[in-house]
């Protein structure tokens, strides 16, 4: 019987908001997750350079984007923005990625980590950590996105 070793993958998780993007990453075996400082969003997407630097520094091989679906699992305005940004990021970074339903991740991180009224981005990065932990448990696998994204920022 032949066994296949799982391919190591260090993943970046993004909790995308209108003002900031919370960030977290995991080790190659997806055992531990850590937060990174949240990055400010800029109109001209300068934050992609910062995200690229983290990807290079931590040797990350893919990323996941939290999609805030509503209670019925339907796309919200924010979910559409997150989806479009994820596709843009995949194109710019040339990395595989996946979407994860992050319904209530900010509420959960506020309760779980005791963070209230945060303007530093800490709650955003802890939300990214929760999204990452959910992805580690549930999947789905990362996918390559071919072609250029249709929506530009």
UniProtKB/Swiss-Prot annotation:
SUPFAM superfamilies: Ribonuclease H-like
InterPro entries: RNaseH-like_sf (IPR012337), YqgF (IPR005227), YqgF/RNaseH-like_dom (IPR006641), YqgF/RNaseH-like_dom_sf (IPR037027)
Assigned keywords, A-Z: Cytoplasm, Hydrolase, Nuclease, Ribosome biogenesis
Enzyme class: hydrolase
Gene Ontology annotations for the cellular component aspect, listed alphabetically: cytosol
Compartments, as annotated in UniProt: Cytoplasm
Entry EC number(s): 3.1.-.-
UniProt similarity note: Belongs to the YqgF nuclease family.
Record's protein name: Putative pre-16S rRNA nuclease
